């Protein structure tokens, strides 16, 4: 495939709009209607579709769209050893909208051992083909 030189540059941060199927699956999971394995299966399928679309349009760098995350930063922190998810009194306020009241609490030495995002990266890496897999970390 011939690569076209464009008169501009664009970077993909990594986050794509979540498909309705994935949004529904997350709600069902939070309500206890969907198991962790069933949620992961839906995430995997939607990520596979997204990566295929990125390849079709010729992107050289692909991402999972952050489809497994509910926050771009807190999900990463919650995967570290020595960090716990913490409920707080108020969420972040941005343009008069309040987010979920969640944060982090340091409970011990911080480690990255067995961080779940390593498996997430390996999943997109095996689908990348000739493209470069990209994962956003804070």
What are these regions (language model features)?
Residues 1-138:
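Domain-level signal for soluble alpha/beta catalytic cores
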